[in-house]
């Protein structure tokens, strides 16, 4: 929290030369900050520390001002696939403060994120190796989260059909879907990111 600048940005701001096995550049990447937003929400839920509300409000104003020039995919593709984590935090804060600019930001995040509605409609979830399995876990919820702002039934339908396809084409006996890095069908022998996908799939739902 002490790293937050006057414009609302927070976290590391300096890039370093490359080093094998480490990501030392892209310090302004949107995605790592989405992880921190979830932590801040949980901290507020435990403490009611009002500094969290001020902190997140400033950061979301920074996002609204900066995303038009440096969209979610500017530094890496992770933020496009995992924007749901950002979106749910925006709506969480909106439900506490009622600040109208948060809905504007929510719409912008949705526009810049990977379209899971299109993914489902293309039938991508009926094939193998079409998406990174953790991106799927974090992103499949985005349409139903955005439905809180735009009640077009296509968002509900896409999530329902998406989970149906996942169960039919990738479902496994333990209740999760087959995927180590990419979706790999319902063969139970390859390893799966079970713990991570279970956590991320549940989080925003």
Features from the language model and the residues they span:
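Long, well-ordered core segments of solenoidal/helical folds
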Residues: 1-9, 54-71, 104-122, 158-175
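Active-site-adjacent substrate/metal-binding segments within catalytic domains
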Residues: 2-45
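Short, solvent-exposed turn/loop segments enriched in Gly/Ser/Thr/Pro and often Arg
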Residues: 8-18, 55, 75-86, 174-184
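Aromatic- and acidic-residue-enriched carbohydrate-binding clefts of CAZyme catalytic domains
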Residues: 11-28, 115-129, 177-191
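A conserved hydrophobic secondary-structure block that centers on an alpha-helix together
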Residues: 27-92
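Structural helix-adjacent loops and short alpha-helical linkers that scaffold large soluble proteins
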Residues: 43-57, 94-107, 147-160
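Active-site region of glycoside hydrolase catalytic domains
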Residues: 82-115
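Conserved small/polar residues in nucleotide/adenosyl-binding loops
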Residues: 194-201
